[in-house]
Amino acid sequence: MLTLRERQINAIKQMLNLNSQQPKALAAEPVWKILIYDRVGQDIISPIISIKELRELGVTLHVQLHSDRDSIPDVPAIYFCLPTDENLDRIQQDFSSGLYDVYHLNFLAPITRSKIENLAAAALHAGCVANIHRVYDQYVNFISLEDDFFILKHQQSDQLSYYAINRANTRDEEMEALMDSIVDSLFALFVTLGNVPIIRCPRNSAAEMVARKLEKKLRENLWDARANLFHMDATQAGGGVFSFQRPVLLLLDRNMDLATPLHHTWSYQALVHDVLDLGLNLVYVEDETASAGARKKPKACDLDRNDRFWMTHKGSPFPTVAEAIQEELESYRNSEEEIKRLKTSMGIEGESDIAFSLVNDTTARLTNAVNSLPQLMEKKRLIDMHTKIATAILNFIKARRLDSFFEIEEKVMSKQTLDRPLLDLLRDGEFGQAEDKLRLYIIYFICAQQLPESEQERLKEALQAAGCDLTALAYVQRWKGIMNRSPSISQATQYEGGGTKTVSMFTKLVSQGSSFVMEGVKNLVVKRHNLPVTKITEQVMECRSNAETDDYLYLDPKLLKGGEVLPKNRAPFQDAVVFMVGGGNYIEYQNLVDFIKQKQTSNVQRRIIYGASTLTNARQFLKELSALGGEIQSPTATS
């Protein structure tokens, strides 16, 4: 069964094959073509199709729509962009300039009738109607970061951010446009999946606005005989991603949990995102190999599914990753030594001598070893890359005491007693950066049942002395007041935390042969626990009766008349799409991945796809909270 990511790749490959079925004989000579995309199209393609794969598909040139481009005759031009006025104006300009002989127009979202008529008029005026071969609505306007993780925007993601949804002075038409943008992308997602979901969401939230609009859009499409996109033949061969049973779409509002996005983390992928700004599966790390005095250039590191080490360890605790890198390095060195030893034992100096001695077992072993050299070199490249990334993370851990922050926050969330009073930690000049202390305090404030005013003031004074900007606290305080008055479960009881225990550091990592100097870093083992998003997902998938989730809306787009009443006899859901309106993070994603792994049995295969309007790390989220806090402190300053 194809994953979401694989189905999106297939849709884009079909588009690059000029919207005809991919030939089964891959050896067939591809049709050479040019790919022209806007920034949104680029963001969709870059995490899932490499430049090498584009070349294999016949794409000789890929360029930005709004860049200066020369005329290239006799080669099909594939456009992949949103049907915005700005983009359509540029396409019409290309028509007038006669840049290409053949145009294939592929829009990420459906183009309106009026816009297509304007485009046709421009083509007629430019005399290139015969040159336009295809115009397609592609329904792929989302970004697949993993097989089971997607976001809606990367560049200009602030348009769909937590701040954009919650700011005080958003006009009604702006909010409508924002919600429509989310709905259009979710609709495209389910067209790609080939399934119509049952929708659940909390009432009186941004999630409810999305849910009602999406239900309406799905229902209208299902009952339109000519335009129904959910027929088996209207999607890719093989039916929907989810088998037999329909999935549940659980729409959640970021307001349900502000602590997790600020939480210091300990798993590899989430750490890369938190401290190195991982974006679209690409991270930039300063090149330490630069010669002395030379300016260090950031080196791009691609973290994709072809990287076996990444796929195995992205969810692992950092010390486990460091140990695994060390083991991989030792394995590589052993393989290298084996080749050298075999060559020496046979008296072989160069590659040319091998041909004269293909007579015995030793030679056969050497031939196999030499043939495996390309794989060995690729293994070495990946080891070097992950050593570079892990070293950069380790430097941050030591400089900012990230291991201690993670350990303390886990204790705060699981209501354990801290070894040192929080006030002492915040006053400690050598304990982390100002941003780290502010994150810790906000989590402490959110998780505390009652925090006396006098204690709050002392803690705030310590934060200010540490150089913290407290603007975000104005918003967090207002948010907590509203959440405490809501009928749903109190925020203070939502968090359970797992707690941690410190075990002795791996001996391999403190030996002199290690690439990593791990002294002073705690080897924390985290007790498995469910975050708020995972707890709600479990309750909804299991159809368990719960005061909070029983009140969630229940919408079924397949019903001619929309009903909101829970059916009495409900079977548990095997598959779920969990979508966070207002921004998600790798911490929640990894928690859901770990949860669903535990739920797998030999008889039942369950799947969860996690998605979010945007992907933010703690620094970015704190910035959004500060912007919202600034509006509260000086409302007249906002326009």
Swiss-Prot record:
Annotated region (4 X approximate repeats), positions in chain: 85-500
Keywords: Cytoplasm, Membrane, Repeat
Disulfide pattern: none
Main location: cytoplasm
Location in or out of the cell: Cytoplasm; Membrane
UniProt xrefs under Gene3D superfamilies: 1.25.40.60, 3.40.50.1910, 3.40.50.2060, Syntaxin Binding Protein 1, Chain A, domain 2
The UniProt record lists the keyword RNA-binding: no
Domain of life per record: Eukaryota
Tissue: In embryos, from stage 14, expression is seen in posterior midgut, esophagus and salivary glands. No expression is seen in larval imaginal disks.
GO molecular function, one term: syntaxin binding
Sequence repeats: 85-121, 203-245, 423-460, 464-500
InterPro entries the UniProt entry points to: Sec-1-like_dom1, Sec-1-like_dom3a, Sec1-like, Sec1-like_dom2, Sec1-like_sf
GO biological process, one term: regulation of ER to Golgi vesicle-mediated transport
GO CC annotation terms, alphabetical: cis-Golgi network; Golgi membrane; Golgi-associated vesicle
One Pfam family, short name: Sec1
Membrane-spanning intervals of the chain: none
Membrane topology: Peripheral membrane protein
Function, in words: Non-vital for development.
Similarity-based family: Belongs to the STXBP/unc-18/SEC1 family.
Protein name: Protein sly1 homolog
Organism: Drosophila melanogaster (Fruit fly)
Taxonomic lineage of the native organism: Eukaryota, Metazoa, Ecdysozoa, Arthropoda, Hexapoda
